[in-house]
Curated annotation (Swiss-Prot):
Family note: Belongs to the sulfate adenylyltransferase family.
Record key words, sorted: ATP-binding, Nucleotide-binding, Nucleotidyltransferase, Transferase
Provenance organism: Gloeobacter violaceus (strain ATCC 29082 / PCC 7421)
Superkingdom to which the source organism belongs: Bacteria
Protein name: Sulfate adenylyltransferase
PANTHER family: PTHR43509, SULFATE ADENYLYLTRANSFERASE
One term of GO molecular function: ATP binding
One record GO biological process: sulfate assimilation
Reactions catalysed: sulfate + ATP + H(+) = adenosine 5'-phosphosulfate + diphosphate
Enzyme Commission no: 2.7.7.4
Pfam families documented for this protein: ATP-sulfurylase, PUA_2
Keyword Transmembrane helix: no
Length: 392
């Protein structure tokens, strides 16, 4: 490899945002905490606050005002013209909003009552929940988990710049916690000029492993960035998934070409729009490429199998600034005795080993390992143990 790079890809919008309080600022705000009105925010808002502050959501410096919100919902762009596909907002009830005055600083507290951030209130506005659901999630069905959140949240959005008072270690995965500035430096230290990001909220099976390794053939490094924020109640817990990832990497991946780090974001399940969002966030972490597979960030049957890939063609490459690597569904092909997709397999469905998620979960509950062509035995054993513990 040629001489090590001195910098990574530019962050989205050109500047990596840092809204984390210095020790001096933190002391100032904590000393004056008694004078702040305080607003309790949910876990998703806490993770959004954190990601804004550390630059994961660059160029955002706070929760969106009404003009940016409407522009994102309708056009997938900020009013500046920068591509942004998911509204990042702070909902409160109308009753709470009435007690707040534009221009004041608000203390943001988490579910335990701990003061985690400051919002300089620039605006408060109402919004159309049905329109947000229709445009962002492509459905108004309240059974959709993302739509359910929108319908159930407060009727007023608060907007303004934020400050995160303290960057706290993750209670479970502190050793895997890399902020965008950290991951960018890690890529430079490794001499990686090109890095592919992979988003996941599920255990990695052979199909995922295959497309990651296909991507590794054309880039310098893999940034495995599993989501550990809020997900659906029936998703595999984050600690179990992380154990699967660590075991898999240790045994089956080139250790010098993979970095595993947590993504503190919450899932929206917004399918195509969230695929764009996930790519832009990984760009902020320093990735030059991003893997988009089948039904990325989807749920149920709300989106077409490859809608999350097609949406990338709605934007000019320079407006995204990160290259999507699009893969079809992978499977084990018995005829060639290896992993393939319909692009590379000469066989029909009869020679493909493919198991539905429902079938796999049923096997794991019964203590049965799926075939090694579908998942690595080490991963299967971790999942069996976890599922059986849940059932006790």
């Amino acid at each position: 490899m040629s001489s090590a790079p001195k910098q990574t890809i530019a962050p989205h919008g050109g500047t990596l945002i840092n809204q984390v309080a210095t020790a001096e600022q933190r002391q100032k705000y904590q000393d004056g905490a008694g004078g702040f009105k305080r607003v309790r925010i949910d876990d998703r808002a806490v993770s959004d606050l954190e990601l804004i502050a550390i630059g994961g959501f660059s160029p955002l410096t706070g929760f969106m005002g009404s003009e940016d919100y409407h522009s994102v919902v309708e056009k997938m762009r900020l009013t500046s013209g920068v591509v942004w596909s998911i509204p990042i907002t702070l909902p409160v009830s109308a009753e709470v909003a009435e007690t707040l005055e534009i221009g004041e600083s608000l203390g943001l507290e988490d579910s335990t009552g701990t003061l985690v951030g400051i919002l300089d209130l620039a605006e408060k506005y109402t919004y159309d929940k049905l329109r947000e659901a229709e445009m962002v999630y492509r459905t108004t069905d309240e059974k959709h988990p993302g739509v359910k959140v929108v319908y159930g949240q407060g009727d007023v959005y608060l907007a303004g710049p934020i400050m995160l008072l303290e960057r706290r270690p993750h209670p479970l995965f502190a050793s895997r916690q890399l902020d965008p500035a950290d991951s960018r430096q890690a890529f430079i230290d490794k001499g990686w000029r090109s890095v592919v990001g992979f988003q996941t909220r599920n255990p990695i099976h052979r199909a995922h492993e295959y497309i990651q390794k296909c991507a590794l053939e054309i880039v310098d490094g893999l940034f495995l960035h599993p989501l550990v924020g809020a997900t659906k109640s029936d998703d595999i817990p984050a600690d179990v998934r992380m154990h699967c990832y660590e075991v898999l990497i240790e045994k089956y991946y080139p250790l010098d070409r993979v970095i595993l780090a947590i993504n503190p974001a919450a899932m929206r399940y917004a399918g195509p729009r969230e695929a764009i969002f996930h790519a832009l966030v990984r760009k902020n972490y320093g990735c030059t490429h991003f893997i988009v597979g089948r039904d990325h960030a989807g749920v149920g049957d709300y989106y077409g199998t490859y809608d999350a890939q097609y949406i990338f063609y709605e934007f000019e490459p320079q407006d995204l600034g990160i290259t999507p690597l699009m893969f079809e569904h992978a499977f084990y092909c018995k005829r060639i005795a290896g992993m393939a997709t319909t692009k590379t397999s000469p066989s029909g469905p009869e020679d493909r080993i493919h198991l539905s998620g429902t079938k796999v979960r049923a096997m794991l509950r019964e203590g049965l390992e799926p075939p090694p062509e579908f998942t690595r035995p080490e991963v299967a054993r971790i999942l069996i143990e976890a599922i059986q513990k849940q059932g006790q």
